[in-house]
């Protein structure tokens, strides 16, 4: 597994520098008085948990890195344990819809609300923690929704949620097969372009690079 991590490097640091400061995703948007010249990079994983989750968590722990896991609804005690481990290790647990089925999720505001409530309640029941961050499947500007995405965005705001898209991808969601080193190279080639980067990766059984 290729893990870049969430880190803040000095403005003049080059790609490949050692992590200097670990930050959670919620600190990407800072109060004006806390803004610095450092680059900030948030590592995020979508679609989990999966059988790869324990290995991802082990690697993150080894390197003292915190990440955000935007999870879907998975059933069974094994999945419940993975949810709990994400929280126990100090990572941010975010929502990525229960079903991840675009045709159902984005059919109407009612459908979206039902899906949201189902996942929100499940995660709170399993972990004891209330989620406050959300990532839309396909992103907030996807073209597959039958409903104006602004309706969903407004609803999340009413629930006290913040949604996050991404501006850097590692390439693990494409048809092309990349090695772990190539995934890292893809990320490092893009993070140098931004002061604040949100890196999209996936925690899925079929993605084991």
Residue ranges, per PLM feature:
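Active-site beta->alpha N-cap acidic-glycine motif
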Residues: 18-136
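Terminal accessory/targeting
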Residues: 1-41, 58-67, 181, 192-209
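Catalytic domains of cell-wall/extracellular-matrix polysaccharide-remodeling enzymes
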Residues: 55, 77, 100-209
